Amino acid sequence: MSGHPGLTTHVLDTARGKPAAGVRVQLCRVTGDTRTPVTEAVTNSDGRTDAPLIERGSLKQGTYELTFHVADYFKGFVAAADPPFLDVVTLRFTVGDTSGHYHVPLVMTPWSYSTYRGS
């Protein structure tokens, strides 16, 4: 998988049918009950972060959490509930093969979300 970054994300707002710009994303490494911050970013107009969350070669085996601050995003739209139903969405996942590319998208509406390991 030469040329691919280690860990990336993408946020899509399926209620509006477009990428979700301005979503704050935090990445932590999880060891037992301890969460160690790795990085924080905000999605751009394409719903992606400007840089990989972890570069290829720096990705380590272990458990990670991506936290998406979706309430702040949805507060900007009339169709969302007040207060928004979803506040933060936290995805916990495990990295086994550090030579691979881990793309962890969030597909969301104001009331639901899903994820998958993309390419």
Swiss-Prot record:
GO molecular function of the protein, one example? hydroxyisourate hydrolase activity
UniProt keyword Lyase present: no
Q: Which Gene3D superfamilies match?
A: Transthyretin/hydroxyisourate hydrolase domain (2.60.40.180)
Q: Which SUPFAM superfamilies match?
A: Transthyretin (synonym: prealbumin)
Q: In which pathway does it act?
A: Purine metabolism; urate degradation; (S)-allantoin from urate: step 2/3
Q: Which residues bind substrate?
A: H10, R48, Y116
The cross-references to Pfam families, in alphabetical order and at most eight, read: Transthyretin (PF00576)
Q: Which UniProt keywords apply?
A: Hydrolase, Purine metabolism
Which PROSITE patterns does the record associate with it?
A: TRANSTHYRETIN_1, TRANSTHYRETIN_2
The answer to whether UniProt assigns keyword Hydrolase to this entry is yes
Q: Which InterPro entries match?
A: Hydroxyisourate_hydrolase, Thyroxine_BS, Transthyretin/HIU_hydrolase, Transthyretin/HIU_hydrolase_d, Transthyretin/HIU_hydrolase_sf, Transthyretin_CS
GO BP annotations listed: purine nucleobase metabolic process; urate catabolic process
Reaction(s) catalysed (UniProt annotation): 5-hydroxyisourate + H2O = 5-hydroxy-2-oxo-4-ureido-2,5-dihydro-1H-imidazole-5-carboxylate + H(+)
Q: What EC identifiers does the entry list?
A: 3.5.2.17
> Which family is this sequence assigned to?
Belongs to the transthyretin family. 5-hydroxyisourate hydrolase subfamily.
Its biological purpose: Catalyzes the hydrolysis of 5-hydroxyisourate (HIU) to 2-oxo-4-hydroxy-4-carboxy-5-ureidoimidazoline (OHCU).
What is the protein's quaternary organization? Homotetramer.
Instruction: Give additional notes from the record.
Output: HIU hydrolysis also occurs spontaneously, but more slowly.
User: What protein name applies here?
Assistant: 5-hydroxyisourate hydrolase
Q: What is the lineage of its organism?
A: Bacteria, Thermotogati, Deinococcota, Deinococci, Deinococcales
